[in-house]
Every structure is written in C-alpha cells, then in structure tokens.
Amino acid sequence: MQTINLDKLDLCDGQTLLDLGCGHGRHTHAAYFHKRCRAVGLDLGFEDVKITRAGFDANPDLEPQTGTPRRYDLSVGDALALPFADDSFDRLICSEVLEHIPDYQGALAEIWRITKPGGRIGISVPHRWPEQICWLFSEDYHNTPGGHVRIFRAADLRADFEALGFAYRGKHLKHGLHSPYWWLRCAIGVNNDRNIFVRAYKKLLEIEILKNPLPLRLASALADPLMGKSVVMYFDKPQDGPLDGPLDGPDSTA
C-alpha cells in the first residue's frame, strides 16, 4: 500500500532515496523496484527493519543487472539524529511518521539537512478531520506508547517546511476507503479486531491493496478527495535558479 506517489516524487535511475520511518518497508520496496536507484530504509524499531529485510529476501530482483544497479540499505536510527551526512539524498519519503514524534520540528530540521539541494521530498500525515473523528471515538487510538501525539493541520505543516526553506509543490489526499474502517474500529473498540464488521471491512481493504479491482479503484477515486485518511505533500529543496511550477497546477485540496 503506497501513500507517496513515486511519479510525483520524480524518482530517477541512479538516485538515492531515504524512506524515513520505513516501518515494514512498503515505500522502500516500491522505490527499489520503481527505478534503478539506491533505496535506504530507516526506522527506530529493529523488528520493523528486520521485516523490511525479509520482504527483500522474499522478493529478490530477478531482472538482469545491466546499466545502473539497484541497491538497498537498511538501518536503525532516530529521526532526530539521522546517521547520514549533510546533503545525502536526492529523494526522501516520510510517510505517517511525524504524528508520532513529540519534537517533530527536530525531525523536519534533519530532513532539511540530509536532503540535497535540488532534491524532492514526499511527506504524509493523517488528514485532520478523519483523524479528529478517530480521536473523538477512542482514547485508545492515540493514547498508547508510540501512538499519535498530535493532529496536524496541513497548512501549518506546510508552513513549517516552508520556514526551513523548502518550496511547496502540491498535495493530494489518499486512502479514502480507509477512513470509515478506522472510524468503525474506534467506535467499537480499536483493539476489537474480531468484530464481524471489522473483519469484513478489513477483507475489503486487503482486496483493494492486493488486487485493486475496477469497482474498488472507482470507489477509491471518489473517496480519496472527500475523506482521504492521509494528506500527502511534496516539497523541493531549492538550488540556484528558478523553481518549476506546481506538480499538478493549482492546489485545490483542503
């Protein structure tokens, strides 16, 4: 399940990408196979990094190694003190991570530090009003160790990145079909995954993720701009010279 659009990230062969807070590696794996790049996955949790590695072991690159080789590296590390030199990465993904970090401003400063001039980043956090409903229905949803510590307003987070010097390129919403699932989970008990309705909805989402048939693609296309679970934003770290225009014309999402 990808949240960041790798085409909007404009990932190219030969580039180096960091998936910051990679979790089980969904974006690390996707970037690795999307282009002949070096995909680096980093997470605070060692077990998560082990699962990411297992994903590569289970799905090796079987294409002939001609031209620019693919490469991946995995690491355990803290978003507030990243183990990389300044200007290390052409592209960076930080998906559904910042809402977990009390000092998220420190993480933003590290993102600025390690992104190359001319680099592009893709950031996603929970969309404000669907997240507010989850918090309203359930204390357990966010009041757990390692859980969500804040609800972002997209305009404020954009301003935080722009204050560092990043240039905003655009945004979109994603995973609209997932919002009602989490509202349901929160309403009946976020840890009650045996409920018949929860199990049925989870199965539907698994079909969307694994097979994505046409009816679910159409439903997702309608739901994403209305109630996307995640808001995704793209920024460039400027270098000398004028910046290109927005990725998709005027920004029309709330």
Residue spans for each PLM region:
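An amphipathic, basic-hydrophobic alpha-helix
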Residues: 2-8, 154-157, 211-220
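Conserved SAM-binding loop
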Residues: 3-134, 156, 233-235
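Short, hinge-like loop/turn segments at secondary-structure boundaries
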Residues: 57-60, 139-142, 186-190
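A conserved catalytic-core signature of glycosyltransferases
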Residues: 79, 147, 152, 230
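Short, glycine-/aromatic-enriched active-site segment of Class I SAM-dependent methyltransferases
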Residues: 126-150, 158-159
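A structural motif corresponding to the C-terminal end of an alpha-helix
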Residues: 160-166
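Conserved S-adenosyl-L-methionine
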Residues: 166-176
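A C-terminal cap/extension of S-adenosyl-L-methionine-dependent methyltransferases
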Residues: 175-254
